[in-house]
Amino acid sequence: MTKKYSLGFVGRKAGMSRVFTEDGRSVPVTLIEATPNRIAQIKTVEVDGYSAVQITVGARRAALVNKPAAGHFAKAKVEAGRGLWEFRVEDAQLGDFAVGGEIKADIFEVGQKVDVQGVTKGKGFQGTIKRYNFRMGDATHGNSLSHRAPGSLGQRQTPGRVFPGKKMSGHMGAVQQSTQNLEVVKVDVERGLIAIRGAVPGAAGGDVIVRPASKA
């Protein structure tokens, strides 16, 4: 089965709000800052081995842009952004894009299902209760040491080791995560906003990638 590729959009999570429907229902939404994505490069099968659209968004001070990146942006005649992202597209779609052009929020429609990818909030080093929802030990009844202990890590001399993947204390959060099949509630191109029903990964101010849902 041939995989179908589709164009996405890079925005910034602004925070959460709510909108009211015509019948008075309150719908919780996440607001995404959707400033136009600038096309920095078109990748083709002949040159790069695959078809993709490379975009940038936002702005970055010239002092923070190294020479290779500055040359890349200058060649495309686009302002240096805060990063570069790529979206694989079908070969037949490449004719719809041009280097230096813009992709706006109107590629999405109200009611459309989307997948949103972001970096989750970092929680630092956490124990198994917070990290994996382990059950706590008894608060009293003779328990004086193991209130938040994870319990056994394995067996005995055989196998004599802790199996890989064992749930233990460690760094929590700050990983890429996708939330699938969220509904687009509103698209405001003039104000540069997309309202998506429900929560999306990450903290306010973080970059998120919005794509048409892969399982809709």
Curated annotation (Swiss-Prot):
> In the record, which positions carry N5-methylglutamine?
Q157
A GO term for molecular function: rRNA binding
- RNA-binding among keywords: yes
PTMs? Answer: Methylated by PrmB.
Query: Can you list the GO cellular component terms from the UniProt entry?
Result: cytosolic large ribosomal subunit
Q: Which gene encodes it?
A: rplC
Output this protein's name: Large ribosomal subunit protein uL3
Keywords per UniProt: Methylation, Ribonucleoprotein, Ribosomal protein, RNA-binding, rRNA-binding
Q: How does it assemble?
A: Part of the 50S ribosomal subunit. Forms a cluster with proteins L14 and L19.
| Function of the protein | One of the primary rRNA binding proteins, it binds directly near the 3'-end of the 23S rRNA, where it nucleates assembly of the 50S subunit.
Q: In which organism is this protein found? A: Xanthomonas campestris pv. campestris (strain ATCC 33913 / DSM 3586 / NCPPB 528 / LMG 568 / P 25)
**Is rRNA-binding tagged as a keyword?**
yes
Name the Pfam families on file: Ribosomal_L3 (PF00297)
Q: Which InterPro entries match?
A: Ribosomal_uL3, Ribosomal_uL3_bac/org-type, Ribosomal_uL3_CS, Transl_B-barrel_sf
Q: Which family does it belong to?
A: Belongs to the universal ribosomal protein uL3 family.
Residue ranges annotated as coiled coil are none
Q: Which GO terms describe its biological process?
A: translation
